[in-house]
Design a protein with these regions (language model features):
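Sec-dependent N-terminal signal peptides
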Residues: 6-12
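N-terminal secretory-pathway/extracellular module detecting exported/lumenal segments
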Residues: 20-103, 113-140
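Positively charged n-region of N-terminal signal peptides that target proteins for export
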Residues: 1-4
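C-terminal motif of bacterial Sec signal peptides marking the signal peptidase cleavage site
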Residues: 15-16
Length: 140
């Protein structure tokens, strides 16, 4: 028993202090406030966020997705509303929880003056450069 306690303690230190095998050179997003990230540009890529092949990489889990969506406006500063529709579209990522796999989240997004709501695809596992999608603006 006397040997078991130091052995368990040592294993916590050894395994708990190892570095991640996934490296990132991406800078964490700047926040406007605790629930909104700071965006600085609108994407010129018309597929950005609108397809599962080109999702918005928010990182930060569900909170990261909400911080991103809270930063969006309509093109003329209109207030944006959104509803999570669910998850889809399994993909491989070193940041996935089970078997290096993640799922994209689909959000229905709208603002006043938009004829039809749009669906945006967000990746909460990986972080990339975030911009507002085409036909959107962002809070300043």
């Amino acid at each position: 028993m006397r040997l078991l306690i130091p052995l368990v303690f040592s294993s916590f230190i050894f395994f708990g202090c190892r570095t991640s095998s996934v490296s990132s050179t991406h800078t964490p997003p700047v926040l406007l406030d605790s629930s909104t990230i700071s965006l600085t540009a609108v994407s010129e890529d018309s597929s950005y966020g609108y397809t599962e092949k080109n999702p918005i990489q928010t990182g930060g889990g569900a909170a990261g997705e909400r911080r991103y969506l809270n930063a969006l406006t309509g093109p003329n500063g209109e207030t944006v509303t959104y509803v999570r529709l669910g998850s889809c579209c399994a993909f491989k990522t070193p940041n996935g929880i089970i078997n290096n796999t993640g799922l994209l989240d689909k959000y229905e997004v709208r603002y006043e003056g938009l004829n039809k709501s749009v669906i945006l695809y967000l990746n909460m596992y990986d972080t990339g450069e975030m911009k507002a999608p085409v036909n959107f603006g962002y809070k300043k």
